[in-house]
């Protein structure tokens, strides 16, 4: 008995393409959720009062201008193109920080992630890495949160996580 194909090739290809598109939308949606959670966490860290001469209490830095918190945000990119995120609302007078954050996130995507689906969470001010290296929590606890949420995301989408 011969095997006979009943489904047209283009119908099968279309079905596979639709399923890939559906999975991609689900991944982007879930990465957005993780990005929003990480940004909300990082921006909500307490800032000690900035009395004259007072030093910050680690792990929290003093947020004098709002630029650093305003530069914290996320983007989701597919094959080097930002598809979601990119909103960096200003806190206090932190308009400069918001612009720096958007610019830095786009640079990171273009430079580091030309292929695949990625979530990039950034603190775009040039001194963010310096504060983090000195022990202040700029994005550190947000990174821990992401490391917890990503495996949950993958499992919910049917991927095996080891």
Which sequence ranges carry the predicted segments?
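Protruding loop/beta-arch "assembly-hinge" segments enriched in small, turn-prone residues
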Residues: 132-162
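Acidic-enriched, low-complexity/disordered segments with a strong bias for Aspartate over Glutamate
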Residues: 10, 63, 79, 137-140
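N-terminal targeting and processing segments of secreted/endomembrane and organelle-targeted proteins
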Residues: 1-3, 20, 27, 147, ...
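N-terminal, Lys/Arg- and Ser/Thr-rich interaction peptides
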Residues: 1-22
